[in-house]
Amino acid sequence: MTNSSEFTDVLQSRDPCVSNGIVINIDPIDPEPTPIRKEFTCEDTFHHEHHGNSEGFKTLTAFLCLMLSAFLNFFLLTVIHDVVPRQPLPDLTFMIIPQQRWAWSVGDVLSTVSSVVAFTIIFLHHQRWIVLRRTFLLGAIMYGLRAVILGVTFLPPSFHNRDEICQPQVNRTAMYGMEIATRFLTYVITLGLTSGQDKILCGDLMFSGHTVVLTIMYFVQLQYTPRGLVILRYIAAPITFLGIAALVVSGGHYTMDVLIAYWLTSHVFWSYHQIFEMRKDDRPQAPLSRLWWFWLCYWFESDVADGKLVNKWNWPLEGPQRMHTIMNRINYKLQ
């Protein structure tokens, strides 16, 4: 028990840290105050603030890695456009279904819809920084690998009417550097979305970047959606696969481009989650730790608790209070 003056001092204290680690628990049934061990100390508060800063820094670093990979893809496209041959390769899908250029816009729209849904889920997830960082990292890995493939093997455009769709190739003249810079800035501003352009750069085929985005966004929805929203997963599946099909039907990609992109992305995504949901002590000895990207990502996951993240939602902003109440009710119904 504690005396009255000590009890009053604790109640009036504004300091969130108690030096002796004791806080007073007031039981509504038993009016006698009972001292219990405080759940965190001054050191814990400092660690929590440091941990929050570290999480933000890691997320920013992951985003910069993604931007570096994406910009490298854009730059390579501006160069290889003038190198790739013009005669398209035979493709079974093109033999069965005539190419439909309107389908490319459908692929862009479905990619955007899937991304908006996935980032909304990330925004509402109570571990949003971890999920966002993982999404950035997975995108950086896939686009980094894609940059390597683009830089070593050049496939001809898959369009049958390539002269109407692809920009003309340019000889390396004195103005070639300015042409490359203009192309690069255009793709940076539009984030690679080309459905609104009359003519586009051609040659970035193996493997499909749109399919990478569609697949990662789809898997994010599968992995981080609360159990009560299982219907969302059934909506995400047709959006994803219709978007992938539209890319091929439009003639914008060979069938092998999207198949390889989906296969690689699925392996990287689920391998990443399998290994980083293990106990920290077991990760370096796991067979998947031999993957080339494991140690690149190890630092990003060093402060994440063992096991799978609990898929709960909360409102990330301080206000309005009504949104916090709504999120609590939604959480209760979705679990």
Curated annotation (Swiss-Prot):
The keyword Transmembrane applies. The chain crosses the membrane at residues 60-80, 104-124, 136-156, 200-220, 229-249, 258-278. It catalyses: an N-acylsphing-4-enine + a 1,2-diacyl-sn-glycero-3-phosphocholine = a sphingomyelin + a 1,2-diacyl-sn-glycerol; an N-acyl-15-methylhexadecasphing-4-enine + a 1,2-diacyl-sn-glycero-3-phosphocholine = an N-acyl-15-methylhexadecasphing-4-enine-1-phosphocholine + a 1,2-diacyl-sn-glycerol. Its EC number is 2.7.8.27. Pathway: Lipid metabolism; sphingolipid metabolism. Pfam families: PAP2_C (PF14360). It is found in: Membrane. GO terms for cellular component: endoplasmic reticulum membrane; Golgi membrane; membrane; plasma membrane. One of its GO terms (biological process) is sphingomyelin biosynthetic process. PANTHER family: PHOSPHATIDYLCHOLINE:CERAMIDE CHOLINEPHOSPHOTRANSFERASE 2, SPHINGOMYELIN SYNTHETASE. Belongs to the sphingomyelin synthase family. This is Phosphatidylcholine:ceramide cholinephosphotransferase 2. The gene is sms-2.
